[in-house]
Amino acid sequence: RLSLVGSEMCIRDRHITELIRKGADRGASIILFPELCITSYTCGDLIQQPALLHAAEQALGYILAQTRELPIVAIVGMPVTYGNALYNCAVVFAQGRIHGVVPKTYIPNYSEFYEARCFMSGEEIGLATIRMCGQDTDFGRNMLFNIGGVKFGVEICEDMWVPAAPSLHQAVDGAQILFNLSASPEVLGKHNYLLTLVKSQSARTQSAYIY
């Protein structure tokens, strides 16, 4: 279990690296981490600070270097700057190579969620190129990944809770597995509703839905 409180970058990258190693040792092919796991979801306005954003990319670079020899795909969450905007993203990588960066499409701005203060929606981004950790990689919301013969798509938290979820398009394009990075808080009665939602999304997309 990965804690999502605080912004201790030097601890977070090592913790994530350790979990990726454990996953590889246990024979896992893909490991999914929570939304914004590198910085934590609860950074508040600190998430916009250049120092924190720089540290996040450095942390990703450390993880890439430390897991380069491991035969496992990892999906982590982190804030990413593209152009003049900040996006809540999933980064897909394996053996030191970044395969793509997926921005969150639907940005919640209600109750305890106020992401619109910090993040832009990735809805208008079709497919672009972004440079991270010295690598040029794809950046877009409806990417389909094919690693090791397995086709999969990625969306982030709120993206699943809307009628036109990105995963629907990814499934039509051939995704066999759909991954959702989330950092939703525990609320009384929410778990059962969430379980129903995940089952429904899996049935609608005829895929394995990993949340």
Where are the regions a protein language model picked out?
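Short amphipathic alpha-helices and their capping/turn segments at secondary-structure boundaries
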Residues: 14-28, 167-168
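Active-site catalytic loop in hydrolytic enzyme cores
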Residues: 58, 85-173, 189-197
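Short glycine-enriched, charge-decorated loop/helix-capping segments at active-site entrances
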Residues: 45-53
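Single conserved hydrophobic/aromatic residue that forms the stacking wall/gate
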Residues: 1-6, 11
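Active-site beta-strand/loop signature of hydrolases that rely on acidic residues for catalysis
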Residues: 23-46, 75, 96, 159, ...
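Short beta-strand-to-loop element that shapes/binds the nucleotide-sugar donor at the catalytic cleft/hinge
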Residues: 77-80
